Structures are given as C-alpha cells and as structure tokens.
Amino acid sequence: MGKSAQFPFHVWLPDSMEGPTPISALIHAATMVTAGIFMVARLSPLYELSETALSVMVIVGAISALFLGLVAMVQTDIKRIVAYSTLSQLGYMVVALGASAYSAAVFHLMTHAFFKALLFLAVGSVILGMHHDQDIRNMGGLGKYMPWTYATALIGSLALVGVPFFSGFYSKESIINAIRVSSVTGATVALIAVGIGLFVTGFYTFRLFFYVFHGRERFQRQQ
C-alpha cells in the first residue's frame, strides 16, 4: 500500500512532483509507484492463500480510487492534479488485484503508463509555456497558442477518462467486469465506489483540460 501510495499512505507522492516534468512522466507514470502493483501481481500465489488480504486490497483500492479522485477535483496546481489522478488510477489496479484479476491489473498498469506519460509531457509543455507558473487559475485559452500540446493533452485525457476506442476504456472495463463477478468481501461496495470514481475521473480531467486550453486568457503575456 505504501509503495503504491494508496490511502492512507498517499501523502508522500504529490510532494515528490517537484522535479522536472519529463522525469515525472517516466518515474510516476511508468515505474516507481506502479512497481508495487507489479510486485503484488508477481506474488499472486501468496495473496490467493488469504481471503482477508484480498478483501483489504479491494476495500483500500476502492477508497483510494474514489477519495483521491475527489482530492484531484479541488487542486489548482496542474502537476498535483495529475499526481492525484495517478493515485486514483492505482486504486483501480489494487481493486483488480483484490478481485484476483491480475491480468486486468497489469493491463491497466500498461495502458495507464502510456497515456499518463503523455499527459505529464503535455503538462510540462504547458508549464514551460507559462514560464513555470503551475496554477491553472492563471491559464486559459492556451489551445490556440499550443496546438500540438492541445492535441496530445486531448488524446491523453480521452484515454484517462475511458472513452470508447481508447486504451483506458478497455482496461477499465476489464477491471469493472472482474469486480462485478468477484465474491470477495467488500466487492459490492468497491463496485459502487469504482463506478462513482469513473464520473469523478471525467470531472477532474476535463476541469483541467478546459481550465488550461479553453475559456478566456487569464495570464499576462511576456516578451
């Protein structure tokens, strides 16, 4: 739980976002926090021997997926929004592990690594264009100034939300189907939490997208 930054051991990850954004794209999206998910998947025969361990994973993962998504909804720092989004998506993977759907967890781990790295790099481009201002309240209307960044951020956002025909749709669907048929204690509550979490994901993702790329310009132009 601590390695994958799950509730209540999640407080360290947002503060680790202070480094360069390309490093965050590599470490946070594809390697560091996802190592805990991969470790549990590799040790699946051990976890299958304990019904209690599986139940704890389902419940903790569901809480993380929903609660940390709600936290992302109220953030104003662009990198922290993406950081809490990562924690929320890791919650989906933990739920899949608790439901013994190890292939679904690793599938979402792989798809998430690609579209979250894409989002991190888009965020880095925005921060550079804003002269290192990371407050989304100071942005707006950047779509016409950064068309390539706009396009990549849109693709990453659609995949994160789980729009059909994007990778996130298929991996999230496999997790939801796994928890729906699971008999582990807490599976029903987890299914409800994950279902609500899907709408929360859409809200904070497009809140970020429209705050940054659409609307009126809230920044001062610099030469």
Predicted regions and their residues:
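Hydrophobic transmembrane alpha-helices and their helix-loop junctions in integral membrane proteins
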Residues: 1-223
